[in-house]
Amino acid sequence: MKTEDNGSAPALAGDHGGVDQDTPDAGDRTEQAKHKTNGTTEKAPKSSNAKDPSRPRRKKARRACFACQRAHLTCGDERPCQRCIKRGLQDACHDGVRKKAKYLHDAPDGALMPGVGGNFYNNAMRNNLPLSRNGATTVNTTSQQNSGSSYYPTPQSNSYNVYQDTPLTQNSFPSQSPVSPTFNMKTTPTARSNSLSSSVNQQPPNTTVSGATQSQNPFAGPFFDPSDPALFNFDLSSMNFENRYGALEFGMLGHMATGAGDSPTDSATQRGSMGRSGSTQYSTTPITGAPGFGESPGNQQPFMFGNDPLLNEWPNSQAPNQGHLNVSGVYPQGGMMHMAKSDAPHAFAIESGPASFSSPSATTSPHINSGYDESSLSNTVVNKSNGLTANGQRPAITTPSLKHQSLQFGVKRRQRNPSTVYESVKEPYAYTNRFHNLTAFIQRRFSPQKTLQIAKALASIRPSFIATTKTLNRDDLIFMEKCFQRTLWEYEDFINACGTPTIVCRRTGEIAAVGKEFSILTGWKKDVLLGKEPNLNVNTGGSSAPGSGTTSRGSFTPRSSTLENATPGRPQPVFLAELLDDDSVVEFYEDFARLAFGDSRGSVMTTCKLLKYKTKEDMELAQSDDNQRWNNHLRKGGIAGEAGMNQLGFKDGKVECAYCWTVKRDVFDIPMLIVMNVSCQCF
């Protein structure tokens, strides 16, 4: 075999011609000629036959080089490959460009490299990088060649910066990411100021990875380079993906999700971007000492993500004659409370860093001091130290850090903490007494025939009430009331946000919540409906059953003196039956008996007549002839504004409406409340 090897050398050297002779048939003919020249009579080895199935096959390369790819020949994994060495093309031997699928057309070529042998960014390489004198780590990729394969980056991603984490301490960061292991919740404004002053003359440590050692601006390149694996700060080789493009996409989503808490808090700059230009200003508020970040929107070099604490609040020397306008100095803290609602859902904004990632609430939130505040706007502490400069230059707007700011309410607002619901409810609700009050009201107002119809409807669901409540003890009844109050707490926000006239009442028919639009439509005040003010209504819609036999049934609905004396000072909400005329009340209780324990998702859509709130003076005024002209005007020209809504039904005391209502049940599957939406049918 040594003779065969020596004889094959001229054949390899003669392969530099333009004719390619690397096919298996040509190799067989060459070996047969060598055997004849040496005078041997032995046949060619069995393995030299290309069609022999026992012949060892050459291992397929993961990616062919450019020359072998164009010649459609078998290549190897080594670079340069053996064929390029034979042809003298070892200097130009590099991986060929593989045709990509349609969904990978926007992927860089380097991201599709299979295997884990490429020179991608990883944590092991980053931890072994030596530091230079100015804090930057320089790595030459030409000196780190992997024995398996090499990655040839695209020209646009020839160099990029990698921020190291080993030599940096906590004092080097003005703020830290809450997801990092070294995040400290007890960072004081003084410590933040000291860390900022110590890092003024320092440059951010960077690692330049390129073909030659060079220094470039990390933000002078493209807006976002997806071929930069160091952008995602994790080892892509350890990810279980078929190609690196999937790992890059996964890392992008994770980076966007975890980096939202450290974005700059300056709302005056461009949204979603941040600059590192010479016009960046840095100031400190006189009250909290918290740093404020501001910049001129004119000179701005945006970068994609702001999760690096060194870049969020990067300090620079303040330009002379450059004024600062602090938002807390222009807008008083008490005057901004109409925007900082305590009853709004507490969430972490994208452009503000949360103090913690725990579930926010109205009492634990560091931004808002919830509760009642009787102080007026004049007594609110106002920061007026930062203002416009006298030279007339346009000031740079800065926003102080909200982490150390305690906002106070300048107006009295209702406390919107759901925890108060569970703390305030101590006794179960007296549904039995309320049903007795409802029965007494129905007997006083309605005729015997209509009273019998309502009684039959309520009697049909009475056994179901008894069956569902007989196993409930006192604690269950208290918990039932807590469920009602907690559900009502949610519905009050919906009522305020919805422009449709809406009322919410208990299963007894007592009004529990009402919207402003319903009060405008019917004239019933909210405090009157909830029982906080006396009910002076005398409008009952008249008797719908002529000849009922009782002349004492006028238009006045008196309160039972025995019931009022039994519960002195207790609010007496208005019943839903007091808001409807006789026929509408009968129809309502017949539908309620069907939905109370029937279809839990069912609803009723029908028409009704709502009774206007009228006192004795209103009833006397309605009898005059002047109002007839107003009613004719409503029929012809319609209504306009709130004043026109108040005049609906002023003559006869009834407003024709269409309403939709449904029944909500509690955890014991008992009817808990009734939600009703009303729409006027005046046109």
From Swiss-Prot:
GO CC annotation, single: nucleus
What SUPFAM superfamilies does its record include?
Zn2/Cys6 DNA-binding domain (SSF57701)
Q: Which GO terms describe its biological process?
A: cellular response to starvation; gluconeogenesis
- Residues in the DNA-binding region are 65-93
- Entry annotated with the keyword DNA-binding: yes
Q: Where is the composition biased (Polar residues)?
A: 38-51, 131-218, 264-287, 314-325
Which PROSITE patterns does its entry note?
ZN2_CY6_FUNGAL_2
Q: Major location, coarse class?
A: nucleus
Q: Does the keyword Transport apply?
A: no
| Secretion signal, residue range per the UniProt entry | none
Compositional bias ranges of the Low complexity kind? 354-366, 540-555
Q: What Pfam families does the record tag this protein with? A: PAS_13
Q: Where does the record say this protein resides?
A: Nucleus
Q: Which stretches does the entry tag as region Disordered?
A: 1-58, 131-224, 261-329, 354-374, 537-570
* Alphabetical UniProt keywords: Activator, DNA-binding, Gluconeogenesis, Metal-binding, Nucleus, Transcription, Transcription regulation, Zinc
Q: Which top-level group of life is the source organism from?
A: Eukaryota
GO MF terms held by the record: DNA-binding transcription factor activity, RNA polymerase II-specific; RNA polymerase II transcription regulatory region sequence-specific DNA binding; zinc ion binding
The job of this chain, per UniProt, is described as:
Transcription factor which regulates nonfermentable carbon utilization. Activator of gluconeogenetic genes.
Family per record: Belongs to the ERT1/acuK family.
Name it.
Answer: Transcription activator of gluconeogenesis acuK
